[in-house]
Regions:
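Short acidic/polar capping segments at secondary-structure boundaries
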Residues: 24-26, 52-56, 76-80, 90-92, ...
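Loop-centered beta-sheet repeat module
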Residues: 63, 68-89
Length: 176
């Protein structure tokens, strides 16, 4: 919510303190457009449409274009599921006004909803210095899709598989 302040702080302090990750990689990773870069570099991502701020498009048009049954809309710069909504081809009209308000203020993602989030949760692999250190599994509370603890989600230690670790290492290799 205080993105501009954070960017200013980073610019002012990047030569005064040492960040664990470089200023450039932090700045790149703040905006979820980094997913587009990873995809261009051969990393599989959730099917996503990237929508620039001010784009004139409706949710109906997006569902028609993608033929998805369910989707998630969210700002490209967001944390803790701020302005993140799970919508379907049957209820999208309920979200049209909020979508139009947000798209007029900031860039957004329209992503295919991955149902396994509800049953399996979301896995986060932590990489430090390009090396895997540990992983967590985030699960949504019953009746919600958001895995963040701000919304009742639960975080627990997770033992990543070798293929998951390899995927994370491949992602790190594809970062700028």
């Amino acid at each position: 919510e205080r993105f501009d302040e954070f960017l200013l702080w980073m610019k002012e302090t990047k030569h005064k303190i040492k960040f664990i990750n470089s200023y450039e990689i932090i700045n790149w990773n703040i905006d979820k457009y980094y997913l587009k870069d990873l995809s261009k570099n051969g990393i599989n991502i959730v099917p996503t449409l990237f929508l620039k701020k001010g784009k004139k498009v409706s949710l109906k048009q997006l569902f028609t274009k993608t033929k998805w049954k369910e989707a998630v809309i969210k700002p490209t710069i967001s944390g803790a599921a701020r302005n993140t909504y799970h919508i379907t081809e049957n209820n999208f009209s309920d979200f049209e006004d909020i979508f139009q308000q947000i798209i007029n203020e900031e860039s957004m993602l329209f992503q295919q909803f991955m149902k396994n989030i509800l049953t399996q949760g979301e896995i986060s692999l932590i990489m430090i210095g390009g090396k895997y250190t540990h992983a967590v599994k985030k699960t949504a509370k019953k009746g919600d899709f958001r895995v963040q603890d701000d919304h009742g989600g639960k975080v627990e230690i997770y033992n990543a598989t070798q293929s998951e670790i390899k995927f994370a290492e491949d992602c790190i290799e594809k970062c700028p």
